[in-house]
């Protein structure tokens, strides 16, 4: 027997449907994602912490879930909003259906609502705070909860979703033929620069990755390029990172507002001063810009999808990218030593920067995809090239 569920927005709009997840009450910022596939990767992306994800594609759950496609060890999204959930998933890799997967992880979710109407409302008014309630329904209680939610502006969530302890990562991408993950340096890119003299062996690049909410596929793409990755908590002092003598430092994706992350901004300033090769993605991109002296701004609806066109301003190439962010770098505030490398063809917002006086660059979207295209994957190779040039 199905349980009732409601979505209540801060403006008083109420959507009634049925529960396809856990019972209870959850609050957060309601956003929409336009990707047709990859719902598991979306839900397990830590960048969605304190956000409720509306998936605009009508049928969600067709291919079920498999543990191999998780992008984090925990679900940080505040809830899921969909139009329809197929009764029976069909895929040779599927281990469990959507409702069972959500219930096991305690995620509140609603189906059977008009997601087109909701998406148009969010597009017109901007991201809304909302409350999802499943099981025992109380509209007034849900509305009160939605209006009490403070919103993401000014909210530092990187320290919330970050790992609590340092760990090492050497696992590459998934090989479906062998049903296993590739090992360190599987792509054999750029490692010759680190061949030990006379040994005939190629050594991996030592990369320290600041975890602000890192996706696992980012770590895999670094590993298969010959990077021996040490993942550290978001608030790790930069002195501890430099003591590891890394060839490069990676700044991960993550949720929330970048401006309150003073600990990260201060650390990145020192990395810039020390000329350490540095590569940032998503939140890491915004933090690099802040460390360089720029400012960020809250977007009306943000970018959430897997089909966003971005232009590489250096070569003129247009790439289709995966995007997931609600804040953006304000190009008008970039200092003279920072040049723009990429720009969105949807709304003209900044998508990439590079410092002219330090080996540091960043990209707003997700070159690791998961889900989405890998048109921007060569940025990982650029990071390897920076480290090789410094060796």
Swiss-Prot record:
Gene3D superfamilies: 3.40.50.880, Carbamoyl-phosphate synthase small subunit, N-terminal domain (3.50.30.20)
Molecular functions (GO terms): ATP binding; carbamoyl-phosphate synthase (glutamine-hydrolyzing) activity; glutaminase activity
Pathway of action: Amino-acid biosynthesis; L-arginine biosynthesis; carbamoyl phosphate from bicarbonate: step 1/1; Pyrimidine metabolism; UMP biosynthesis via de novo pathway; (S)-dihydroorotate from bicarbonate: step 1/3
Binding site residues for L-glutamine: 47, 254, 256, 283, 286, 324, 326-327
Residues in coiled coil: none
Enzyme active site: 282, 366, 368
Catalytically driven reaction(s): hydrogencarbonate + L-glutamine + 2 ATP + H2O = carbamoyl phosphate + L-glutamate + 2 ADP + phosphate + 2 H(+)
Presence of the UniProt keyword Phosphoprotein in the record: no
Any one Gene Ontology BP term: 'de novo' pyrimidine nucleobase biosynthetic process
EC number: 6.3.5.5
Keyword Nucleus assigned: no
Domain of life: Bacteria
Alphabetized Pfam families for the sequence: CPSase_sm_chain (PF00988), GATase (PF00117)
InterPro entries with a match to the protein in the record: Anth_synth/Amidotransfase, CarbamoylP_synth_ssu, CarbamoylP_synth_ssu_N, CarbP_synth_ssu_N_sf, Class_I_gatase-like, CPSase_GATase1, GATASE
Record-annotated Glutamine amidotransferase type-1 domain positions: 206-391
Keyword terms of this UniProt record: Amino-acid biosynthesis, Arginine biosynthesis, ATP-binding, Glutamine amidotransferase, Ligase, Nucleotide-binding, Pyrimidine biosynthesis
Region (CPSase): 1-202
Quaternary structure, from the entry: Composed of two chains; the small (or glutamine) chain promotes the hydrolysis of glutamine to ammonia, which is used by the large (or ammonia) chain to synthesize carbamoyl phosphate. Tetramer of heterodimers (alpha,beta)4.
Cited function: Small subunit of the glutamine-dependent carbamoyl phosphate synthetase (CPSase). CPSase catalyzes the formation of carbamoyl phosphate from the ammonia moiety of glutamine, carbonate, and phosphate donated by ATP, constituting the first step of 2 biosynthetic pathways, one leading to arginine and/or urea and the other to pyrimidine nucleotides. The small subunit (glutamine amidotransferase) binds and cleaves glutamine to supply the large subunit with the substrate ammonia.
Family to which this protein belongs: Belongs to the CarA family.
Cited NCBIfam families: CPSaseIIsmall (TIGR01368), PRK12838.1 (NF009475)
Protein name: Carbamoyl phosphate synthase small chain
Organism listed in the record: Xanthomonas axonopodis pv. citri (strain 306)
Gene coding for it: carA
């Amino acid at each position: 027997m199905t349980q009732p569920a409601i979505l209540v927005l801060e403006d008083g709009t109420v959507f009634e449907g049925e529960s396809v997840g856990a019972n209870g009450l959850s609050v957060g910022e309601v956003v929409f994602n336009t990707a047709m596939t990859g719902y598991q990767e979306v839900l397990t992306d830590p960048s969605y912490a304190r956000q409720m994800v509306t998936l605009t594609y009508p049928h969600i759950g067709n291919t079920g879930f498999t543990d191999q496609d998780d992008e984090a060890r925990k679900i940080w999204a505040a809830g899921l909003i969909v139009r329809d959930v197929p009764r029976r998933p069909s895929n040779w890799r599927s281990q469990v259906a959507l409702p069972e997967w959500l219930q096991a992880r305690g995620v509140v979710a609603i189906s059977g609502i008009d997601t087109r109407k909701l998406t148009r409302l969010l597009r017109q008014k901007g991201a809304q705070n909302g409350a999802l309630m499943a099981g025992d329904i109380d509209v007034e209680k849900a509305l009160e909860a939605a209006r009490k939610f403070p919103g993401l502006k000014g909210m530092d969530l990187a320290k919330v979703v970050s790992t609590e302890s340092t760990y090492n990562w050497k696992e590459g991408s998934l090989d479906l033929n062998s049903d296993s993950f590739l090992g360190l340096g599987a792509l054999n890119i750029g490692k010759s620069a680190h061949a030990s003299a006379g040994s005939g062996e190629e050594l991996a690049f030592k990369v320290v990755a600041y975890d602000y909410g890192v996706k696992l596929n980012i770590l895999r793409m670094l590993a298969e390029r010959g990077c021996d990755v040490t993942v550290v908590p978001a608030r790790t002092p930069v002195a501890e990172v430099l003591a590891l003598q890394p060839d490069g430092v990676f700044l991960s994706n993550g949720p929330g507002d970048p401006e309150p992350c003073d600990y990260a901004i201060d650390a990145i300033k020192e990395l810039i001063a020390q000329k350490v090769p540095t590569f940032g993605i998503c939140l890491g991109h915004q933090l690099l810009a802040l460390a360089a002296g720029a400012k960020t701004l809250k977007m009306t609806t943000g970018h959430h999808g897997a089909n966003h066109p971005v232009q590489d301003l250096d070569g003129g190439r247009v790439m289709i990218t995966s995007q997931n962010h609600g804040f953006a770098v304000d190009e008008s505030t970039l200092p003279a030593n920072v040049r723009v490398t990429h720009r969105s063809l949807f709304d003209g917002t900044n998508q990439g920067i590079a410092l002219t006086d330090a080996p540091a660059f960043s990209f707003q979207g997700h070159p690791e995809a998961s889900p989405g295209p890998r048109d921007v994957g060569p940025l990982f190779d650029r990071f390897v090239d920076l480290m090789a040039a410094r060796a």
